[in-house]
Amino acid sequence: MNLFRKKVKEWVYSFSTEDHYAEYNSNDQFNMGMRSQGASHHDVEAHAQSANDNILSMEDDIDLDSMDGTPSEGVSEVLLAWRHIDTWTSEYNPDLNATLSDPCTANDIKHAEEDLEVVLPKALKASYRIHDGQEDLESMTGTSGLIYGLQLMTLDEIVAMTQRWRSVADKLNKQATMSKHSSVGVSNGSSMGSTASIGSSSQQQREKPRNKFKLPYIPEQKSIPPETVLPLYAHAMWIPVLTDNAGNHIGIDLSPARLGKHGQVIMFGRDFDTKYVVAENWGDFLLSFANDLEAGNWLLVDDSDDYLAGEGELVFRDKKSNGPIQDYLEVLKKRSWNKYQEQLRTNQETMQSGEPTLTSTRTHKKTSSFELDDDFDHTTTTTEHNGNEFIESSVPETNSDIPQIVKKEELDETAEETKEESNELDVKTEEIAPESTQIIEETPETKEEEVSEQPEEAVAEVTVDANIEEPEQQVEEQEVLLENEVTDSVNNADANTEAVPEVEEKKTEIETETPAEPIEEEEESTNVEAPQVEEEEDSTTAEPAETVSKSKKKKNKKKNKKKNKANQDDNVNELSHDFETVQL
């Protein structure tokens, strides 16, 4: 008798309720969605109004306040998307519109959440309060899935498919656990003995056929963008919503990775070792599909000869490029990849704009310090100073005012060379025996020119040797070297001026004793060289000429010393000027 009453109540319940997923139970709490095995539960106001094809009245029937506790992102996008989808399907493909089911009730959604032990996002709840997926696809030939061939599953199918993928995830977890235990058992067996190892291996062989999964191995799992989806083949918190009836799905991710977002829409399945994030929420995904329909990115393909089969299957084709028909899953993959690449470019641009430029860092080094940097390439530049060229080494774009540092040994060598050359000139002038006053008067000029040219040549040698790569020395060494050079040059000048009073006294004595005699002219040019003067010395043998030559020799020596002193003073002035510029 009780069984008969139960059947009658179930029959009455089926006619009096709008629930699709919820079933009759004699317990009133069960029918009101108060199951004990669910996750977090909230009081739900059951809606008893009849389904209506008008979306406006359906929006009023949806009670969003009953969906507290879940993110509300995407709800308005869902309502807007379904307006366009219903309008388009009723106009261009009525048979496809006829496959859309009536809305499910809040009690259905609550029972599904309790069975899955999850809390669905508000956007998905609002979508199923408008249409509970598609039905009667097999009975209606010439139709396909709503989303370019992808079928929108009913709430009952979603629960069943989720349970299947959870069983797959459980098997994979068991395999991973067994592999860990087997590796531990092998390591322990090596220490325990051969008998225990043989027994464990035989037990593993018996359990292996029972726990073996269909796939021989699981490839490496990835995601686009990286670290947005967990790198797993299957997960218990991935809720499939669309299916291609071949093991691939578009669903809701309720357990994202570190960079993911709760409720994001992902692609996963048997053909997707790389998971793709196609939208941030279900409302954005539905709205993108509606935009494709409004943009004309669609075709209706009818391969059947049956004229009563309907308008055909809905497929994707890009209207702008007028390209071929494309699989919508591949289109979504491409869009996800392009969005990821665009995000990378944006991040690179922001990073480049935030980093200081190379020019600014080099300018900062120039203004803050006076040190040479070994990391920069060194070049040489020439500047004019008092008629002489000084070759300076400078760093491009930075230390262009720093002169080249010269070693102390090089300066000492050049000073010794100039001193030796001046001594040689003095010796040559002593050996000269002039025969005429013209020679005596012209030779000092030639010697003056030679002596004046010697410091310039020495300076040129210094500047040439300055090209040696010595950029690492500090400016302080240069200051010390320049001071030493100045002191050496001053000491040489003082030594040359000591013999001037004695020469003047001897000159006056000789001039009073011996009168000067006329001397014949032998050369017309002023640039008299040393070998020619030596030949003239052989031709002068007279004794009076010897006395005259001694007086003139002293006179010439005096003039040469004066010229040398003047030239050395000029060099000292130039070096002191350089020293002042370096100090500045």
Swiss-Prot record:
Residues 447-459, 467-486, 511-540 have a biased composition (Acidic residues). InterPro entries: Knr4/Smi1 (IPR009203), Knr4/Smi1-like_dom (IPR018958), Knr4/Smi1-like_sf (IPR037883), KNR4/SMI1_regulator (IPR051873). One of its GO terms (biological process) is regulation of fungal-type cell wall biogenesis. It comes from Candida glabrata (strain ATCC 2001 / BCRC 20586 / JCM 3761 / NBRC 0622 / NRRL Y-65 / CBS 138) (Yeast). Residues 406-431, 575-584 have a biased composition (Basic and acidic residues). Residues 550-565 have a biased composition (Basic residues). GO terms for cellular component: cellular bud neck; incipient cellular bud site; mating projection tip. Residues 182-204 have a biased composition (Low complexity). This is KNR4/SMI1 homolog. Residues 346-361 have a biased composition (Polar residues). Residues 176-210, 346-584 are annotated as: Disordered. Belongs to the KNR4/SMI1 family.
